[in-house]
Protein backbone atom coordinates (compact mmCIF):
# COMPACT_ATOMS: atom_id res chain seq x y z
CA UNK A 1 0.00 0.00 0.00
CA UNK A 2 1.45 3.36 -0.98
CA UNK A 3 1.46 6.45 1.15
CA UNK A 4 -1.37 8.10 -0.81
CA UNK A 5 -3.47 4.92 -0.57
CA UNK A 6 -3.01 4.74 3.21
CA UNK A 7 -3.93 8.43 3.53
CA UNK A 8 -7.09 7.83 1.49
CA UNK A 9 -7.96 4.79 3.63
CA UNK A 10 -7.54 6.80 6.83
CA UNK A 11 -9.67 9.64 5.47
CA UNK A 12 -12.51 7.18 4.81
CA UNK A 13 -12.58 6.07 8.48
CA UNK A 14 -14.77 8.40 10.56
CA UNK A 15 -13.11 9.94 13.60
CA UNK A 16 -15.11 8.70 16.56
CA UNK A 17 -13.79 11.50 18.77
CA UNK A 18 -14.78 14.27 16.37
CA UNK A 19 -17.28 16.53 18.25
CA UNK A 20 -18.96 17.55 14.99
CA UNK A 21 -19.76 13.91 14.21
CA UNK A 22 -22.19 13.73 17.15
CA UNK A 23 -20.91 10.35 18.32
CA UNK A 24 -19.67 9.30 21.74
CA UNK A 25 -16.87 11.88 21.61
CA UNK A 26 -19.29 14.76 20.99
CA UNK A 27 -19.46 17.61 23.43
CA UNK A 28 -22.57 18.65 25.32
CA UNK A 29 -24.01 22.11 24.77
CA UNK A 30 -21.86 24.42 26.88
CA UNK A 31 -23.46 26.22 29.82
CA UNK A 32 -22.48 29.37 31.65
CA UNK A 33 -20.66 32.08 29.79
CA UNK A 34 -21.62 30.87 26.29
CA UNK A 35 -25.07 29.49 27.08
CA UNK A 36 -27.23 31.47 27.75
CA UNK A 37 -25.99 33.87 25.07
CA UNK A 38 -24.59 37.18 26.31
CA UNK A 39 -26.82 39.14 23.91
CA UNK A 40 -29.94 37.67 25.49
CA UNK A 41 -28.63 38.40 28.99
CA UNK A 42 -27.89 42.02 28.04
CA UNK A 43 -31.57 42.49 27.14
CA UNK A 44 -32.38 42.11 30.85
CA UNK A 45 -30.08 44.87 32.15
CA UNK A 46 -29.04 48.37 31.12
CA UNK A 47 -25.35 47.60 30.39
CA UNK A 48 -22.76 44.87 30.41
CA UNK A 49 -21.34 46.35 33.61
CA UNK A 50 -24.74 46.04 35.31
CA UNK A 51 -24.88 42.40 34.17
CA UNK A 52 -21.48 41.70 35.74
CA UNK A 53 -22.52 43.20 39.09
CA UNK A 54 -25.94 41.50 39.02
CA UNK A 55 -24.53 38.06 38.20
CA UNK A 56 -21.63 38.39 40.66
CA UNK A 57 -23.95 39.31 43.54
CA UNK A 58 -26.24 36.37 42.83
CA UNK A 59 -23.30 33.98 42.40
CA UNK A 60 -21.97 35.14 45.78
CA UNK A 61 -25.39 34.41 47.36
CA UNK A 62 -25.46 30.93 45.81
CA UNK A 63 -21.92 30.23 47.01
CA UNK A 64 -22.81 31.42 50.53
CA UNK A 65 -25.90 29.20 50.46
CA UNK A 66 -23.78 26.12 49.74
CA UNK A 67 -21.26 27.11 52.43
CA UNK A 68 -23.95 27.59 55.09
CA UNK A 69 -25.65 24.23 54.43
CA UNK A 70 -23.16 22.43 56.65
CA UNK A 71 -23.72 24.89 59.48
CA UNK A 72 -27.51 24.51 59.51
CA UNK A 73 -28.09 28.23 58.90
CA UNK A 74 -30.50 29.00 56.08
CA UNK A 75 -30.00 32.72 55.51
CA UNK A 76 -29.55 32.67 51.73
CA UNK A 77 -31.78 31.35 48.95
CA UNK A 78 -30.38 28.42 47.02
CA UNK A 79 -30.36 27.99 43.24
CA UNK A 80 -33.69 28.65 41.51
CA UNK A 81 -32.75 26.39 38.59
CA UNK A 82 -31.63 22.78 38.75
CA UNK A 83 -27.82 22.96 38.99
CA UNK A 84 -25.77 20.66 36.84
CA UNK A 85 -23.14 18.35 38.25
CA UNK A 86 -20.34 20.58 39.61
CA UNK A 87 -21.84 23.66 37.92
CA UNK A 88 -20.25 26.89 39.09
CA UNK A 89 -22.33 29.50 40.99
CA UNK A 90 -21.78 32.08 38.23
CA UNK A 91 -23.20 29.73 35.59
CA UNK A 92 -26.23 29.08 37.80
CA UNK A 93 -26.71 32.83 38.33
CA UNK A 94 -26.55 33.52 34.58
CA UNK A 95 -29.18 30.84 33.91
CA UNK A 96 -31.42 32.36 36.60
CA UNK A 97 -31.06 35.81 35.04
CA UNK A 98 -31.80 34.40 31.59
CA UNK A 99 -34.93 32.66 32.91
CA UNK A 100 -36.23 35.90 34.51
CA UNK A 101 -36.34 34.14 37.88
CA UNK A 102 -34.89 37.10 39.79
CA UNK A 103 -36.10 40.61 40.50
CA UNK A 104 -33.41 43.22 40.15
CA UNK A 105 -33.28 46.96 40.74
CA UNK A 106 -30.11 48.55 39.44
CA UNK A 107 -28.16 50.56 41.97
CA UNK A 108 -28.88 48.29 44.93
Curated annotation (Swiss-Prot):
PANTHER family: DNA-DIRECTED RNA POLYMERASE SUBUNIT OMEGA. GO terms for cellular component: DNA-directed RNA polymerase complex. Promotes RNA polymerase assembly. Latches the N- and C-terminal regions of the beta' subunit thereby facilitating its interaction with the beta and alpha subunits. It comes from Mycobacterium avium (strain 104). Belongs to the RNA polymerase subunit omega family. GO terms for biological process: DNA-templated transcription. Keywords: DNA-directed RNA polymerase, Nucleotidyltransferase, Transcription, Transferase. This is DNA-directed RNA polymerase subunit omega. The keyword Hydrolase does not apply. The RNAP catalytic core consists of 2 alpha, 1 beta, 1 beta' and 1 omega subunit. When a sigma factor is associated with the core the holoenzyme is formed, which can initiate transcription. It catalyses: RNA(n) + a ribonucleoside 5'-triphosphate = RNA(n+1) + diphosphate. SMART domains: RNA_pol_Rpb6. It holds the Pfam family RNA_pol_Rpb6. Its EC number is 2.7.7.6. InterPro entries: DNA-dir_RNA_pol_omega (IPR003716), Pol_omega/Rpo6/RPB6 (IPR006110), RPB6/omega-like_sf (IPR036161). Residues 1-32 are annotated as: Disordered. GO terms for molecular function: DNA binding; DNA-directed RNA polymerase activity.
